[in-house]
Amino acid sequence: TLVVSIFLILLFQPYFLFDVGFQLSYAALFFIVWLQPMFANYWTPRNKIAQFFWDIITVSFAAQLGTLPLSIYYFHQFPGLFFVTNLLVLPLLSVIMLLGVIVMTIAAFSALPIWCIKPLEWGITIMNSIIHWVASFESFIFTNISSTFILMIASYGLLIALILWWKKKSLIRTILVLSAIILVQIILIKNKLEFGNSKEWVVLNASKKTIICQRIGNEIEVISNGLQSEEIQKNMTLQNYATGTFSAITKESPLKNVAYFNRNRILILDNSSVYLPNNQADILLLTASPKVNLERILKNNRPKMVVADASNYKSLVNLWEQTCNQQKIPFHAVAEKGFYRIK
């Protein structure tokens, strides 16, 4: 049934295959159908109330296991209190859904009385309060977990191998589990070494801000125009970059007008810069909407690339792009094309 459902949806909407919600929904459904009966067989409660909450626990655990590799890959975090949330929210959600059906039915035939709307409103308010309360325990949310697409696939391989071994233990399945564990370890070591032996200079796509990351191995230096340490720790673009490159932010520096990286001289012009004609550069970075005559700069300088980050006005970026096209110099608008990287 799940396969037919997936086939029919993708037949009409093939791009849903790349939708995060679609992937998470069907991963959760698949593992609920497959795993929940196995978990449920471990204990049979004697009364209906215990059975109700036991079903919530088994369904929650199966769904969480099924979506774990995908969640870590896309969101780089894992909620440690998902059991608590589900035990408190799901019973209330059932009541809210029932009230919602009643309200919609009455609304279809007549005007809604206030006594009919209030219980639904209170139910939603209580549910949101519970979710907010659980989310406030930030120490139980495991964040900044690095992952890659290959690691996610290998993690699913390990998960499926463990479940098959748990269902029926045998020598072949034991070897399969051990092989999957070794494969995951090899991928982790490879990723760590790959990023540890590389370096790059990246202009991030940060709206109204200039944020540059200079990564040498697994250490990142954040270069910005006034970002405080607290802001850097809370900036999701920076944290996602650090997590995605298996690295850590170790240094913070203010933005300067000249930078050097991998034999490239980078000239950075902002709204307070004064351009000198003999100030040659391989790459020109424009930030904070500087009032410069780009055509004159390009004639005197002839850089290999002109980059405009996301802190510039869109109208200026469009003018700069036209100027670069006329001068036949490559132009990269970070707000449109995404981050710019020098390796």
Regions found by a protein language model. Give the residues of each.
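Hydrophobic alpha-helical transmembrane segments in multi-pass membrane proteins
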Residues: 1-83, 144-194, 342
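Hydrophobic alpha-helical segments embedded in the membrane of multi-pass proteins
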Residues: 3, 91-99
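Divalent metal-coordination and catalytic microenvironments
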Residues: 21, 67, 88, 123, ...
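Membrane interface segments of multi-pass transport proteins and intramembrane proteases
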Residues: 34-57, 83-87, 95, 102-122, ...
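Hydrophobic alpha-helical transmembrane segments in multi-pass integral membrane proteins
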Residues: 66-74, 101, 128-139
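Conserved hydrophobic/aromatic beta-strand scaffold that supports enzyme active sites
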Residues: 87, 101, 211-213, 258
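Alpha-helical transmembrane signal-anchor/signal-peptide segments
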Residues: 191-212, 306
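Extracytosolic and intramembrane catalytic regions of membrane-associated proteins
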Residues: 213-343
